[in-house]
């Protein structure tokens, strides 16, 4: 979580944008991504760094979001939306909301409708990300997370676009066939390392 390392992250951003530095990257070309660290968002909104803000939202109601993103138990969706609105009001930059679509978990018609409602007062872009399945399915509590079918992805995207005035995009995920898409490779490597660690070593 970048905003838990606020000083280091903002120092790096300043070095990247420095006019006498080697990179000279403008603030409008840099984005800070967060899982929803509300105090960090508010602090960044007061900073002189005019960078973009991307928030991993991933659910439209607190019960589901708290299951898949424990940070929500501390800063629920209402607080997160208020912080995002504050960021826009102070910076004048659209916020990006990242939203992972999981079959029968976050891809319901009601989710599309709620997503349009909770973002209605915040100038933003909504980036839909189809879930990249792990094999076997990653299970948390009583839920197994799966990627929605193409038909369900299209239905959600279409419904959201019809319900909101915001820009809605859907990420084209690549590398799933070799478990190298977002979130997959790390899990495969971690599982392999765990298997090696559990193998008895010769005395």
Locate each region found by the language model.
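Generic structural signal for residues in well-ordered beta-strands
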Residues: 97, 168-170
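Gly/Ser/Thr-rich beta-alpha loop segments that engage phosphate groups in nucleotides
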Residues: 1-2, 38, 177, 185
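Conserved AdoMet/S-adenosylmethionine-binding subsite of the radical SAM
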Residues: 2-163
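Radical SAM enzyme core and accessory elements
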Residues: 162, 170-203
């Amino acid at each position: 979580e970048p905003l838990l390392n606020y000083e280091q992250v903002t120092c790096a951003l300043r070095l990247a944008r420095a006019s006498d530095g080697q990179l000279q990257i403008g603030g409008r070309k840099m984005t800070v991504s967060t899982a929803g660290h509300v105090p960090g968002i508010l602090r960044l909104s007061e900073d002189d760094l005019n960078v973009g803000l991307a928030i991993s939202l991933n659910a439209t109601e607190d019960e589901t979001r708290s299951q898949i993103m424990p940070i929500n138990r501390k800063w629920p969706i209402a607080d997160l939306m208020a912080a995002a609105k504050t960021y826009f009001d102070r910076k004048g930059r659209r916020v990006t909301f990242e939203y992972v679509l999981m079959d029968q978990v976050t891809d319901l018609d009601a989710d599309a409708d709620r997503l349009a409602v909770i973002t209605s007062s915040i100038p933003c872009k909504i980036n839909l990300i189809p879930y990249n399945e792990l094999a076997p399915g990653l299970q948390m509590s009583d839920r197994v997370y799966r990627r929605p079918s193409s038909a369900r992805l299209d239905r959600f995207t279409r419904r959201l676009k019809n319900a909101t005035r915001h820009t809605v995009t859907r990420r084209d995920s690549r590398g799933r066939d070799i478990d190298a898409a977002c979130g997959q490779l790390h899990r495969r490597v971690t599982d392999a390392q765990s298997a090696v660690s559990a193998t008895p070593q010769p005395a």
